[in-house]
């Protein structure tokens, strides 16, 4: 049986190597005659074909990549046609431009084309990393997104890191002190933080710490400007991770192998951290994807409350200014990040627990 599996693995490796060789050959010889888009499609298909033959994990990754691409496409389609269905247009303002200027603007932004043609042109731009041009500023959306994303990435990164660290620590404390004062206090506050939306928490933090206590400036460009937005973003996911860690920890500590380790005289700290906490973190890892989605969507409103100048601020400004390319670009960009984060969290889940079989 083992010999058969070994031969099967060797055969998969040989086929994968051949496909990689073909992939290199296609890329080398087809470059002068194929357009960039066709070459990109061929390379992607061949790479996924090679990955598909590497085993159950490779097939799972291929399926998830295809599903991710389909999801982003559907979101792009819904966003595009929703923007086109809204009454008026990006240039429908109180002081409308003259007919000549209106015609020039419509031609520049392809608004004089049929909706189907506009969608095809928009998809072609997305394939090349081009999100269009802002109807408000005239700048490329991709440039604005990547300039603003640095701020959003810092806020989201700090919020996610603190949420995971504090959530795991508080959840472990609650599990080890079940039904005691520490457990009840932690569960009370985590329930409260889960129930309060991030934008309300952001407003409360602004009122208390900026206007009442004057601990932080309302408008700031230094590191102080990150403190309150990070707290507003991390409280809810931290609370959820705390409750998740507590439940998982209690379940793991009740397993037979934990009781066996304690019976053999293994130190309590070693039992908890080496055997208990490691297995208790598996559900937390699966929550990383949804947590990323929560932080990204929550940052849109939180950033506008604190005027941090991040991607969320640009998104809200796009809505206010009827800047449709900005709205579509930020929506698709954030959707891509969410899909990618969910895929990566599933793969990390597999690495942490090798027993998971994707078949």
Where are each of the predicted segments found?
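Hydrophobic alpha-helical transmembrane segments of membrane transport/permease proteins
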Residues: 70-120, 214-228
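Membrane-water interface at transmembrane helix exits
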Residues: 28-31, 50, 79, 83, ...
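Cytoplasmic-entry segments and transmembrane alpha-helices of multi-pass inner-membrane transporters
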Residues: 5-12, 52-67, 166-205, 282
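Alpha-helical transmembrane segments of integral membrane proteins
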Residues: 59, 149-182, 198, 221-359
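Generic hydrophobic transmembrane alpha-helix motif, especially the helices
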Residues: 22-38, 47, 51, 158, ...
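Transmembrane alpha-helices
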Residues: 2-58
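Short, membrane-interfacial amphipathic segments enriched in basic
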Residues: 44-58, 112, 116, 128-142, ...
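An internal, D/E-rich "acidic patch" concept
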Residues: 112-168
